[in-house]
């Protein structure tokens, strides 16, 4: 399968890198940092329901959290700027006898299957266990976790689309700015954003099929747009030149230039 072959080649490329030993130490630090934040998110997920119960006595804690889902998605969107886009990863495979569109599609599948899409569950699962389980049981917690994962996958494809367009032309930065500005206005001055977010979150907890289908449709649409955009941006990405620092030589050695 092409997906497993590309994954195996990526691991071999990392091992053959001259900086492999140093990269292993860097990976260890990354894993340690990730474990720290995972533990921190679990702690927040366990303690936050108590604060919500005291601060919003007329609402269930999971309703308060669901109203804040757009904020979590925005933070997740910003964090994903640390990852490369598929057009940045496709270069080693262009000489292979494989269709470029097929390569793009496989790399996009990798985007949806990244472990980072599960990272926020360190917060949402403990929170749901404290607040959702008493009303909807373990099934409600599992359904909620599945819905959150699907939202993060959709957010991953949205982030890839924006980053790819932004690398092509800086004017595309107005796309996410405009979208999040509208959400901010709708959230602070009107209630339709928080109302929709609360309704979606509760539908996910209750296992409503339409909620999952709606997110899957968004994922499919974003994946299709990414497939077309990534294909159009391949060669512009390959032709991009990285800025190399210029080495300045000392003036007292200029006389050597005359002798070649």
Kindly give the residue locations of the regions a language model identified:
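Hydrophobic alpha-helical transmembrane segments of membrane proteins
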Residues: 1-90, 100-260
